[in-house]
């Protein structure tokens, strides 16, 4: 090595030799290279060889001067020294601590015995640093502090001042210098020598350069590392194959060949990974969102809820609630169940090991298998042997993430899929029918749009997701044994590159998919492959029914009478029975037509997106689909059951679903109503016959299932020992056998949750929630009926304006979702003036208006059943009569004859000739004062009259702003001197009922009240003084008018339009001038051509949506008379407005309103 160094130095000093000479020297160096005698590696330098030999010998010559740590490489010791704190590297300022530490510190270094490969010696080991040789080649380091003090005492005699080595300052005393250095500079001083520096990095460099030396261990002493003896090579054997390794990590890497590579598990959810950084990235999913601590949470961020309970984001630091099996991945509720499950794996492995050893013996292998099954209390499978790797019957159905709600909650971390805003994804039906995908960046569930699904469908087969690939039973990937980790996967990375970095891997075949949903769909291929290997179709269904032991899971069967997950998920029955899924073409039935009933193509996203079209009312269902049930002759029994449920929905169930989804009745659990309750439903007899046929087929299929299971149980009893009762994993027929009475009684004690839309039943409300959400597309976010809008900050649909904009035309919620009969038009169409009063030449309603009212939609007329009975006179009729006598002379006002009632407020009055003399009506019914001028000015008040001729004018044009007579008839008080009639006096307010019966009673009371008022007007005595013509006599009907005013206010009130509140007060106020006029002076019922008029109150609207929103106000039933003080206050505010009307010609001023006595 020395010669090579000398040659290298000569080459550096002198000129570069020629290439020939250089190549000759290089060849000489290669020939003289140093090789290892153990492994054969060659090195150009001896130092490199000596460092390499430490790997074989385990020598660690480099020792830490501050602890007992040793290292084989100098760089490793440098890294170790930096791990020490700075306080252990520098010398303490206290004299006792410093002296004790320096006195105890000994370095096993010799002056002449240094064995470093580089021949480097420490500078502090020489005599220059004050080291004195001791016995046994030991060196005792003197305290540098004592050394400095001795030098300082010698200098005090010669020099008067002491300089500072850092800032060149001088001090008279040594103590002052030390205080200055300690306070101003704070230097770092080496504990092993007198080296002092101001930088910590300089101190570390000094220790690495001067104090790190190598030492050869004495004899065959074992090197000690952190107090543990160094193990000799070849001391780590493999327990499986017996191969020995010198290092533990070599053995750990070797053990991956004998077991699964998922060695890194999550302690929260139990998921396992191959690499540690995968686990590290996975642990971020259990924490809060990235950046959520720094930014404030906006109102638009979705809130995670479970059953409408807000879930706060917390960092999960606890352990998992479930125990995970590391060999098969099943979940268990406690450790005892996991230990019992692991015993199965151990017995299976032990049986595999004993099988080759017992082959040479005379024992039959069948006896060994029989003994193993008897130990597990299992009956042998008669049809055929199951492969050793098969896990049939061992998977827990309740914890299957594909079929179970509980495992689905674990997989989604308790966050239920809920759209952030309903309007963001279009209509509600489209949102329910869309596909749900989990966005890993936003960590929320999103709805896949229709355009994206269309692009996926239109994409070529090469770019299609793996779930679209057709798989046939002859596929080599599916035909053989399902190895969890197959060796050949050529297209795995290619498909992963197209997945945009977000993939889900199938644990059975190793394929990678872009989304977890695609992987779930792909798993059906493996389920069909397992079913193809099984001769009977019942094996696949029983594989998910339960675990090996009853203690594997605390969850019990989720459906009454069935422990199978198929009963809770009807879509799984199609996957188990039908081979024509999304990845294969459905085979035609025996009749030549495809089996559309059982193919899973009906639940594809395209069919779900158009699912709302299948729930419409009317005759859009073709008769051939109703009369011809598409049931194949070769269809299995389970498919017949599914077919019967599907075909029944095409019959009467189809119409009932549509009614229940939009506006269900108050008895949702009732049976299917008769066809007489339907609206134009065709082919009722064919539907009935179809239903009977399907019921018989369903009963026949159930008998087949029960017979098949009894036969299977009988075979199991014959094969097992007579004193042992075999464990039935399916538990499907436990109710039919005598041995299952105990289980039947336990299951009967549980609460059964039936579906209100079909015959589905389950023990778990969560499963019922998912069933209604998926199959019936019902929003189950609340317990309210589906026609009520969801509450909360997201429920934009609960607003009245949203209801108007969405175009909802069904019956109001107050009627319980039932259609009510339209009001009869005959009680409004009068053709003669009652009582033969003068002025009967007033025209009746035009024919066009009647035709328009008759042709109005039913849903508009159905809202007219309002609380008409409230307008009947109360028990204060006599008090009103006494308060109305002699308060105003008859000559102060002019009374017009009574006009005929009109059907709508938009009808115009025909011109009638005026009368020069005063003409009074024989009937004392009150009339509104008519104010008519010869030529009305622009700023004059609009005129409203009942239809009689005016006084002082030769001709009065018809007034188009007149209010409807039906409203006036309801607002008219009782005549003077007329006692309360039997039909209207003291009519009580009926209680609020949500049924149709309450609405019919309200309409009957309203009809009676209207008829009694007409009779009262006809039977009034002709000699009664017309004292009701003045304005001061109208407040006499105090109780009656207050009722009418309160009702009319809220009947015409729209929450988004506060102007309607003032219009309601203006119309219903007791003042005569404000009967048809609002506070702003504009008439309330200005009906122009093309307006939409309310048939109840006569108010006109410009848009049909406004009329629909207004008609909902008529369905409100008030149970009290309302506040009386507010009415008096409002009436008093109208008084100044009445006083300003004295300037209008031909009018009579009305005094301020006041409360009657």
UniProtKB/Swiss-Prot annotation:
UniProt cross-references to SMART domains, sorted A to Z: ZnF_C2H2
* Induction statement: Up-regulated in response to cold in brown and subcutaneous white adipose tissue where it may regulate non-shivering thermogenesis (at protein level).
GO terms assigned for molecular function: cis-regulatory region sequence-specific DNA binding; DNA-binding transcription factor binding; zinc ion binding
- One Gene Ontology term from the biological process aspect of the record: response to cold
The record's SUPFAM superfamilies line, in alphabetical order, gives: beta-beta-alpha zinc fingers (SSF57667)
Q: What InterPro entries would the database entry show?
A: Krueppel_C2H2-ZF (IPR051967), Znf_C2H2_sf (IPR036236), Znf_C2H2_type (IPR013087)
Using the UniProt annotation, give all residue ranges assigned to the region (Mediates promoter DNA-binding and activation of transcription).
1-420
Q: What happens when the gene is disrupted?
A: Knockout mice die immediately after birth. 20.5 dpc embryos display an impaired development of brown adipose tissue.
Compositional bias, Acidic residues, is annotated for 575-585
Q: In which tissues is it expressed?
A: Expressed by adipocytes more specifically in brown adipose tissue compared to white adipose tissue (WAT).
Zn finger limits (C2H2-type): 34-56, 62-84, 162-185, 188-211, 236-258, 264-286, 323-345, 504-526, 753-776, 1092-1114
> What segments bear the compositional bias annotation Basic and acidic residues?
1-13, 449-458, 531-541, 644-653
The keyword ATP-binding belongs to this UniProt entry's keyword annotation: no
Q: Where in the cell is it found?
A: Nucleus
Q: What does this protein do?
A: Transcriptional regulator that binds to the promoter and activates the transcription of genes promoting brown adipose tissue (BAT) differentiation. Among brown adipose tissue-specific genes, binds the proximal region of the promoter of the UCP1 gene to activate its transcription and thereby regulate thermogenesis. May also play a role in the cellular response to replication stress.
Q: What family is this?
A: Belongs to the krueppel C2H2-type zinc-finger protein family.
Q: Self-association or partners: how does it assemble?
A: Interacts with PRDM16; the interaction is direct and may play a role in the transcription of brown adipose tissue-specific genes. Interacts with PWWP2B. Interacts with HDAC1; this interaction is enhanced in the presence of PWWP2B.
Q: What is this protein called?
A: Zinc finger protein 516
Q: What is the lineage of its organism?
A: Eukaryota, Metazoa, Chordata, Craniata, Vertebrata
- Gene responsible for this protein: Znf516
């Amino acid at each position: 090595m020395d010669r090579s160094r000398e040659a290298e130095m000569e080459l550096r000093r002198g000129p570069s030799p020629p290439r020939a000479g250089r190549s000759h020297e290089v060849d000489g160096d290669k020939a003289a290279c140093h090789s290892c005698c153990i492994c054969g590696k060659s090195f150009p330098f001896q130092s490199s060889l000596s460092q390499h030999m430490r790997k074989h010998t385990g020598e660690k010559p480099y020792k830490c001067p501050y602890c007992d740590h040793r290292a084989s490489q100098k760089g490793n010791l440098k890294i170790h020294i930096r791990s020490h704190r700075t306080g252990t590297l520098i010398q303490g300022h206290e004299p006792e601590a410093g002296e004790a530490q320096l006195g105890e510190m000994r370095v096993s270094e010799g002056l002449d015995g240094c064995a470093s490969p580089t021949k480097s010696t420490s500078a502090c080991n020489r005599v220059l640093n004050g080291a004195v040789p001791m016995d046994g080649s030991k060196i005792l380091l003197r305290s540098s502090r004592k050394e400095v003090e001795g030098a300082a005492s010698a200098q005090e005699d010669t020099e008067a001042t002491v300089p500072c080595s850092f800032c060149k300052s001088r001090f008279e005393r040594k103590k002052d210098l030390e205080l200055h250095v300690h306070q101003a500079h704070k230097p770092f001083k080496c504990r092993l020598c007198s080296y002092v520096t101001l930088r910590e990095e300089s101190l570390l460099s000094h220790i690495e350069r001067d104090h790190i030396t190598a030492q050869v261990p004495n004899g065959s002493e074992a090197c000690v590392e952190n107090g543990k003896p160094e193990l000799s090579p070849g001391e780590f054997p493999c327990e499986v194959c017996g191969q020995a390794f010198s290092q533990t990590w070599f053995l750990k890497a070797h053990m991956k060949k004998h077991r699964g590579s998922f060695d890194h598990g999550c302690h929260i959810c139990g998921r396992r990974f191959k690499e540690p950084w995968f686990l590290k990235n996975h642990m971020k999913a259990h924490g809060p969102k990235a950046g959520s601590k720094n930014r404030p949470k906006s109102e638009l961020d979705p809130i995670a809820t479970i059953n409408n309970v807000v879930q706060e984001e917390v960092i999960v630091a606890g352990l998992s609630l479930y125990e995970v099996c590391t060999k098969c991945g099943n979940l268990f509720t406690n450790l005892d169940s996991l230990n019992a499950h692991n015993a199965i794996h151990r017995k299976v492995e032990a049986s595999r090991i004993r099988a080759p050893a017992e082959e040479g013996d005379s024992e039959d292998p069948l006896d060994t298998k029989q003994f193993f099954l008897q130990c597990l209390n299992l009956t042998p499978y008669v049809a055929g042997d199951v492969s050793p790797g098969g896990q049939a019957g061992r998977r827990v159905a309740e914890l299957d993430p594909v079929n179970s709600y509980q495992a689905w909650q674990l997989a989604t971390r308790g966050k239920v899929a809920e759209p952030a805003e309903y309007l963001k994804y279009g209509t509600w039906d489209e949102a329910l029918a869309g596909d749900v995908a989990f966005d890993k960046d936003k960590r929320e569930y999103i709805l896949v749009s229709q355009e994206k699904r269309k692009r996926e469908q239109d994409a070529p087969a090469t770019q299609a997701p793996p779930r679209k690939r057709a798989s046939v039973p002859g596929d080599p990937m599916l035909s053989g044994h399902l190895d969890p980790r197959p060796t050949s996967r050529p297209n795995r990375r290619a498909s992963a590159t197209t997945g945009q970095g977000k993939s889900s891997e199938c644990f059975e075949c190793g394929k990678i998919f872009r989304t977890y949903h695609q992987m779930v769909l792909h798993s059906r291929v493996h389920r069909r492959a397992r079913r193809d290997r099984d001769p009977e179709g019942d094996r696949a269904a029983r594989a998910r029914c339960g675990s090996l032991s009853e203690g594997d899971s605390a969850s019990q069967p989720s459906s009454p009478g069935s422990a199978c997950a198929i009963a809770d998920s009807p879509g799984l029955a199609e996957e188990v029975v039908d081979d024509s899924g999304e990845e294969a073409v459905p085979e035609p039935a025996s009749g030549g037509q495809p089996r559309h009933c059982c193919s899973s193509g009906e639940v594809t996203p395209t069919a779900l997106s158009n699912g709302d079209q299948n729930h419409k009312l009317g005759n859009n269902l073709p008769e051939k689909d109703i009369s011809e049930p598409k049931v194949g002759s070769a269809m299995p029994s389970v498919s017949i059951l599914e077919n019967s449920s599907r075909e029944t929905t095409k019959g009467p169930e189809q119409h009932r679903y549509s009614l229940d989804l939009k506006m269900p009745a108050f008895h949702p659990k009732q049976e299917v109503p008769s066809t007489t309750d339907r609206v134009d439903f065709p082919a009722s007899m064919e539907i009935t016959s179809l239903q009977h046929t399907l019921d018989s087929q369903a009963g026949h299929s159930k008998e087949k299932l029960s017979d098949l299971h009894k036969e299977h149980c009988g075979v199991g009893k014959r094969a097992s020992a007579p004193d042992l009762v075999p464990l039935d994993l399916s538990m499907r027929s436990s109710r039919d056998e005598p041995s299952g009475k105990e289980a039947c009684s336990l299951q009967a004690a549980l609460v059964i949750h039936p579906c209100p839309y079909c015959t589905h039943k389950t023990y778990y409300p969560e499963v019922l929630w998912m069933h209604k959400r998926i199959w019936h597309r019902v929003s189950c976010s609340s317990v309210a009926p589906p026609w009520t809008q969801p509450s909360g900050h997201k429920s934009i649909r609960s607003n009245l304006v949203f209801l108007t904009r969405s175009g909802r035309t069904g019956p109001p919620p107050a009627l319980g979702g039932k259609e009510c009969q339209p009001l009869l038009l005959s009680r409004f169409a009068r053709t003669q003036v009652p009582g033969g009063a003068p002025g009967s030449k007033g025209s009746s309603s035009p024919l066009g208006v009647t035709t328009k009212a008759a042709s109005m939609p039913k849903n508009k007329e159905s809202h007219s059943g309002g609380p008409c009975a409230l307008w009947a006179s109360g028990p204060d009729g006599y008090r009103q009569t006494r308060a109305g006598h002699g308060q105003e002379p008859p000559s102060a006002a002019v009374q017009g004859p009574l006009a005929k009632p009109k059907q709508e407020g938009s009808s115009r009055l025909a011109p009638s000739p005026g009368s020069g003399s005063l003409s009074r009506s024989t009937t004392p019914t009150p009339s509104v004062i008519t104010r008519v001028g010869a030529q009305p000015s622009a700023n004059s008040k609009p005129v409203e009259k009942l239809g009689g001729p005016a006084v002082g004018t030769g001709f009065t044009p018809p007034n188009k702003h007149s209010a409807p007579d039906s409203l006036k008839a309801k607002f008219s008080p009782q005549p003077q001197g007329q006692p309360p009639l039997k039909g209207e006096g003291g009519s009580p307010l009926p209680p609020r009922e949500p049924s149709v019966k309450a609405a019919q009673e309200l309409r009957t009371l309203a009809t009676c009240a209207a008829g009694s008022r007409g009779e009262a007007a006809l039977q009034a005595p002709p000699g009664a003084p017309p004292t009701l013509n003045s304005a001061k006599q109208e407040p006499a009907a105090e109780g009656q008018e207050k009722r009418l005013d309160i009702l009319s206010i809220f009947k015409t009130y729209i929450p988004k339009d506060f102007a309607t509140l003032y219009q309601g007060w203006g119309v219903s106020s007791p003042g005569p001038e404000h009967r048809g006029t609002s506070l702003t002076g504009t008439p309330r019922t200005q009906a122009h051509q093309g307006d939409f008029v309310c048939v109840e109150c006569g108010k006109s609207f410009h848009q049909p949506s406004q009329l629909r929103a207004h008609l909902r106000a008529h369905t409100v039933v008030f149970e009290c008379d309302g506040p009386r003080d507010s009415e008096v206050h409002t009436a008093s505010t109208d008084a100044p407005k009445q006083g300003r009307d004295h300037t209008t010609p031909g009018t009579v001023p009305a005094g301020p309103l006041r409360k009657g006595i």
